């Protein structure tokens, strides 16, 4: 006499719950682990190539500026591509938003605030690239950075201004008129969410 095995019938809700559980088990631990992983570095050529695509032109100044920064601070282990403008100039401050990219720790949106000068108010929609050096982890970008003495320079129409907070160095890279005005940048504050508070 054979004994039939009981059949298991899963409802649609059970199947969706099971699928969600499997997805969470496979994804969430990895994403949390990446949050405190130290990002690996990028080569100069990778940064320059991404910069050329981002700004839409090939400039000698970008390559020379990146090489100069790398000689002083090593290789960047993150970079930010973003935009400032679209009504972002309020009370003498500049606001921006973008995405920070890393080689092995993923990417995430970032927002920043910093001072500007009067004639800067007409520059709507400036594209800005930022190089990040010595970033200990992805969340470590969220600090306030002050200017580094003697670390603002203009090469071939591309402006570089170094800012730091302890070991982490952030270098905004701008072209055209924004390159010259970026030299006056006194500080930048990065936040995980958009805010109008610059302090």
Set out the residue ranges of the language-model regions.
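N-terminal secretory signal peptides
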Residues: 1-14, 18-30
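Sec/Tat signal peptide C-region and signal peptidase I cleavage site
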Residues: 31-35
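Small-residue-enriched, tightly packed secondary-structure blocks
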Residues: 36-199
């Amino acid at each position: 006499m054979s004994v039939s095995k009981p059949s298991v019938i899963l409802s649609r809700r059970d199947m969706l719950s099971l699928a969600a559980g499997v997805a969470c088990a496979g994804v969430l631990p990895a994403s949390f682990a990446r949050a405190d992983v130290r990002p690996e570095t990028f080569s100069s050529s990778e940064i320059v190539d991404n910069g050329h695509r981002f700004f839409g032109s090939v400039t000698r100044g970008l390559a020379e500026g990146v090489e100069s920064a790398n000689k002083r601070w090593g290789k960047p282990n993150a970079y930010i591509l973003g935009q400032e403008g679209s009504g972002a100039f309020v009370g003498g401050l500049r606001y921006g938003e973008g995405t920070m990219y890393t080689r092995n720790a993923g990417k995430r949106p970032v927002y920043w605030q910093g001072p500007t000068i009067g004639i800067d108010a007409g520059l709507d929609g400036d594209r800005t690239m930022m190089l990040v050096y010595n970033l200990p982890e992805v969340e470590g970008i969220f600090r306030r950075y002050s200017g580094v003495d003697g670390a603002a320079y203009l090469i071939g129409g591309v402006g570089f201004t170094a800012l730091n907070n302890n070991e982490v160095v952030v270098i905004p890279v701008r072209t055209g008129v924004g390159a010259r005005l970026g030299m006056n940048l006194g500080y930048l504050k990065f936040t995980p969410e958009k805010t109008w508070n610059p302090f």
